């Protein structure tokens, strides 16, 4: 009986140590990406269909492409709310995202140059960022006259 009394605390300690090592903290990854390219907007009534295609690079996925599509509501001025989905694809992986509520493109008085701000929730990631979670902060510009856009993406992802 005495041996059993000593064995129980030792077993309990072993279980606690193995459980603690299995519960490691998520790894934090600072993500920065810069992309530029062409965007098209097709207006039908107050609905704007948006397509964006560009090139650039992002942390851990490398050089590659941005592809996104969505819709906006041009009846709300000067800041047009929009939403959609897209991908950031590089040699070392792909990030799939969807736009969170609150994204907008705010135009100048003539509706030519827009400042774009959005938060993009990662829905899936592959390659070096497989299983990464987080939200990308997107800040950029869009020129409606020539279709050009530039966007900087930043985030602290967890994996």
Predicted segment positions?
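Bacterial N-terminal signal peptides
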Residues: 8-16
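Beta-strand-enriched cores of mature, soluble protein domains
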Residues: 23-159
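Positively charged n-region of N-terminal signal peptides that target proteins for export
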Residues: 1-6
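C-terminal juxtamembrane segment of a hydrophobic transmembrane alpha-helix
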Residues: 18-21
């Amino acid at each position: 009986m005495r041996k059993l009394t000593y064995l129980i605390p030792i077993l309990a300690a072993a279980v606690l140590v193995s459980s603690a090592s299995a519960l490691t903290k998520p790894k934090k990854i600072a993500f920065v990406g810069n992309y530029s390219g062409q965007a098209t907007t097709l207006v039908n009534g107050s609905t704007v269909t948006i397509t964006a295609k560009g090139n650039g690079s992002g942390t851990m996925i490398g050089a590659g492409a941005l592809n996104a599509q969505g819709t906006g509501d041009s009846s709300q001025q000067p800041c047009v709310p929009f939403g959609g989905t897209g991908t950031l694809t590089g040699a070392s992986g792909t990030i799939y995202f969807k736009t969170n509520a609150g994204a907008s493109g705010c135009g100048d008085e003539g509706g030519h140059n827009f400042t774009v701000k959005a938060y993009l929730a990662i829905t899936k990631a592959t390659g070096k960022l497989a299983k990464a979670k987080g939200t990308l902060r997107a800040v950029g510009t869009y020129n409606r006259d020539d279709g050009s856009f530039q966007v900087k993406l930043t985030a602290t992802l967890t994996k």
